[in-house]
C-alpha cells in the first residue's frame, strides 16, 4: 500500500498500478494528496479514495471534488468508497443519493463531531484508575 507521494511516483512511473487508491489516513495530509492527484492526472490514471474509517467518507468526498474541479476535470472512471456507519456522530455528515455524493452544505471538511459524541468518548482518568 502506498503511503506517500514518493511511493506513488515509483509505482506510477513503473506502470505498476492502474488505479491510484489514495488513503487519507496514510498520506500526510491534503498537500501530500494533492501531489498524488497531480501525478495521477499526468499519467491519466483514475483516483479512487479509500474511505473505510470514522469520518473518512466525510473527508474523501472533498478529495474527489478537488480532483474533479482542480486537477483532472473528469468524473470518468472515478469511484469513491462509502461505508454506511457512524455518520450520526458528525455535524454535517456526507449524503449519498442515487449512488453519488452530494456536495456538503457547510464550509470545511465535514469532520466536525457533535459535542455529545466527543463527551461520551472522552478519556476519564478517574474511571480508568478505578478498574
What does each model-identified segment do?
Residues 1-100, 104-107:
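Shared catalytic-loop signature of beta/alpha-barrel
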Residues 108-131:
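Extended hydrophobic packing segments that form well-structured cores
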Amino acid at each position: 500500500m502506498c503511503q506517500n507521494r514518493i511511493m506513488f511516483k515509483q509505482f506510477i512511473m513503473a506502470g505498476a498500478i492502474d488505479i491510484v487508491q489514495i488513503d487519507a489516513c496514510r498520506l500526510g495530509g491534503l498537500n501530500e494528496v494533492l501531489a498524488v492527484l497531480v501525478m495521477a492526472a499526468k499519467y491519466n490514471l483514475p483516483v479512487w479514495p479509500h474511505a473505510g474509517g470514522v469520518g473518512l467518507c466525510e473527508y474523501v468526498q472533498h478529495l474527489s471534488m478537488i480532483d474533479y474541479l482542480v486537477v483532472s476535470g473528469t468524473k470518468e472512471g472515478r469511484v469513491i468508497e462509502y461505508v454506511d456507519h457512524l455518520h450520526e456522530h458528525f455535524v454535517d455528515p456526507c449524503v449519498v443519493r442515487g449512488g453519488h455524493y452530494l456536495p456538503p452544505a457547510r464550509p470545511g471538511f465535514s469532520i466536525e463531531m457533535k459535542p455529545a459524541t466527543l463527551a461520551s468518548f472522552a478519556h476519564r482518568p478517574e474511571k480508568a484508575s478505578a478498574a
